[in-house]
Amino acid sequence: MKNTLKNNPIVIICALLLSVITVITYSKNLDSTDKISRGYFAGKISFGDSTNHKLYSDKVQVKKSSERGVTVLTIVVTDNNTPESVFVKLYNVTDKGTFFIPGEGDFQNVGNLIKDVNMFREQNNFYQTTLANDEGLKNGVGRVNIIKLTDSEIEGELIIIANNSEGKQAQLESARFKAKF
């Protein structure tokens, strides 16, 4: 009986067909998972006296956590073609809405623009909303408008004006992002 099952062409065809279906299903699941986990970040950025240029990334890191008893949302982006980076940390994010940087309240939101992530020891690479400009004015601001927030996905818009320790200004404008947690 065992020999007849092994030599039966219908059994062999069914086994091959099952194998092909399994491989196709597995590969389609991999493709859809890869597309789902990818997000995007696109905006215009300028540092100091440089003209603004596009910052684009399809690798957006978003994380929801708890810090000091409140919900924290962290967004980290590094440009696909340059070492420029954006770091945003928002406190008390529980629903979509508009969040200001640094904001008011017990916890100040964070918005940093980084000119070159590879030169992390140089202070002048870090542009922060909390630093003063070259005239001594603390004019750094930011706004994050979250238009979609679910347990698995976030989408929104972002602008940041920040200064480095020398007082030079950087701007991120017209930025849009979408990512999975």
Can you name each region flagged by the protein language model?
Residues M1-K6:
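N-terminal secretory signal peptides that target proteins for export/translocation
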Residues N7-A15, S19-V70:
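Extreme N-terminal export signal peptides that direct proteins to the secretory pathway
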Residues V11-I12, V20-T22, F41, K115, ...:
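Hydrophobic transmembrane signal anchors and adjacent membrane-proximal interface regions, especially
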Residues T22-V23, F47, T51, L113, ...:
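Ubiquitous "structural anchor" signal
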Residues K35-S37, K44-S46, K54, Q61-I147:
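Surface-exposed helix/loop patches within compact recognition domains
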Residues N52, T82, D95, D151, ...:
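Generic "edge-of-domain/loop-turn" microfeature
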Residues H53-D58, E84-V86, A170-F177:
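Short beta-strand segments
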Residues N145-F181:
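C-terminal or internal capping secondary-structure element at the end of a domain, subdomain, or sheet
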